[in-house]
Amino acid sequence: MEKFQGYLEFDGARQQSFLYPLFFREYIYVLAYDHGLNRLNRNRSIFFENADYDKKYSSLIVKRLILRMYEQNRLIIPTKDLNQNHFLGHTSLFYYQIISVLFAVIVEIPFSLRLGSSFEGKQLKKSDNLQSIHSIFPFLEDKFSHFNYVLDLQIPYPIHLEILVQTLRYRVKDASSLHFFRFCLYEYCNWKNFYIKKKAILNPRIFLFLYNSHICEYESIFFFLRKRSSHLRSTSYEVLFERILFYGKIQHFLKVFVNNFPAILGLLKDPFIHYVRYHGRCILATKDTPLLMNKWKYYFVNLWQCYFSVWFQSQKVNINQLSKDNLEFLGYLSSLRLNPLVVRSQMLENSFLMDNVRIKLDTKIPISSISRSLAKDKFCNVLGHPISKATWTDSSDSDILNRFVRICRNISHYYSGSSKKNNLYRIKYILRQSCVKTLARKHKSTVRAFLKGLGSGLLEEFLTGEDQILSLIFPRSYYASKRLYRVRIWYLDILYLNDLVNHE
């Protein structure tokens, strides 16, 4: 952000209050679609999705769009005329996509400035390893073995768009920008419904930003109450965005409850609480009794319904006892497993045996849900029996083999932290047999005849990749003893959920 502050012709105070003029500056569009700002996005920018502008940035589109924005009536297109209205070879959908991406970049400016100002004079530890999804599980292994219950809930998404717009009012003071954004947002959703059957590519950046802002509102209140009620003062709340009218909103929030503020804190008082969130799921682990966990459940339901005006069904909040129930989180089934140990102790001439029980976090692969995902992608049938991938038979043999091997390695990479590898071998078997049946179908042969003519080289492709990586990490003696297949391995380079997990 410091690199681009020279382009902004406002000082720090005016940037927060006057964002609307930035919509009419051409250099903002250049920054919004700069490859440096979009290198983390897996989709190419919409300027390069069109065949007419696939080689260079078109400033003509931006200039014509700015002229159109001076007259907002020209941006309003009836839904029935969306497909017929073209402007320079594009429909109005194309220009609303540009505005939505631009607004996401502009509105992030005051957020970035406030976040940077809150970090001034503080030393924050930066670690790229903490970005990995697998970094959560070592934390769970250390903490969850001492807890009894876990509160598992799905954070509700606001149904009405106006709730998301109201979230920005506490941070963006420019009324013109808010009105313009509200207008574009409703128009955006109108042609989103119109083009839903045509699978139009819609940039989700602005909706992701609004949803994260909505989550920050919820977590700021939760951590505030958590800090006030806890005996152990937590400092993790400092990484949240700076609040505007925060304490006034807290006072309004307290009016929802019949009891007073100390009574509410008394219900939530527990020094041993751990909170983990990823996307729309969050879990709350504690040593509380079932009664106190139900009070936490009551608190979350009232928080969303009374303060955020979002309907929240209590059925979406599950209270799991880790020693009996499985917790499905990030594609794993987690539970506590009792590991009995017998220790022999000798004192002088007397010896005796001591039975110790060690609690370990057991992480298993949800084979049933993954089998349904494989069946949905036509790798197997509903019973889990491998079938050929008919849509891939037009590709070359090497392309088919590389696709299956890549999927198999990604699954092995993601589920390497499983405590029981039998289900992982079952998934590999389904993919390997599906690959063989696909190649046999392409060559119009049987599986037996195809394997007999090809030899064992095909099956080795599914085994060499992961084993070669592990042999470079672990000592040769450890690798040769086959203990490697019984331990859990967490990788710190996994930034996205596996596609098979996203199906659920």
Curated annotation (Swiss-Prot):
Gene Ontology MF, one: RNA binding
Keyword flag tRNA processing: yes
Compartment annotation: Plastid, Chloroplast
Gene name of this polypeptide: matK
Example GO BP: tRNA processing
Family stated for the protein in its record: Belongs to the intron maturase 2 family. MatK subfamily.
Name assigned to this protein: Maturase K
Upper taxonomic lineage: Eukaryota, Viridiplantae, Streptophyta, Embryophyta, Tracheophyta
Keywords assigned: Chloroplast, mRNA processing, Plastid, RNA-binding, tRNA processing
Function recorded in the entry: Usually encoded in the trnK tRNA gene intron. Probably assists in splicing its own and other chloroplast group II introns.
One of the record's GO cellular component terms: chloroplast
